[in-house]
Amino acid sequence: MKRNHRNALLLVTLSACLGLPAEAADRMRAGQWEGTWTGGGRTRATSECVTQAQADAMNGDAGAVRAHLEKIIPAAICKVTNIKVSAGQIDYTSVCAGKENAITTIYHGDRFESTDSGGARSEAKRVGACK
């Protein structure tokens, strides 16, 4: 069960970090993003193509961010709540396997860093067009 919880938390964190472009000038742009996720004593390499459609879907307010997350993260795995969107930051809460986790992601154009209340960290940078 603990491993499933970690995997669910990883899915939520990566999905949020790699798929939440909003206000493109201040946040992520479409393209290939590579980085690392560290949590539970492990570090994993991450790589994801953020499509223009994903970027466009997330260029909105908290409601648009919520709609995108609910589309890519099955409710059976985690529930996403308390989404707050500002120019260069997204904060939200996820509940996975009954455990609440607060996540903060700060965007710097072509890079970001994210932390959560469970101790996980992730960071990534845009490395170019999608592969």
PLM regions and their residue ranges:
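Edge beta-strand at a domain terminus
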Residues: S117-K131
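Tryptophan-anchored aromatic micro-motifs
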Residues: M28-T43
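Cleavable N-terminal signal peptides
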Residues: L11-V12, A22
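Sec/Tat signal peptide C-region and signal peptidase I cleavage site
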Residues: L18-A24
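Short, exposed beta-strand-loop hairpins at the edges of beta-sheets
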Residues: T104-T105, R111-A120
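Central antiparallel beta-sheet cores of small beta-barrel/beta-sandwich binding domains
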Residues: R44-T104
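Bacterial N-terminal signal peptides that target proteins for export
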Residues: K2-L10
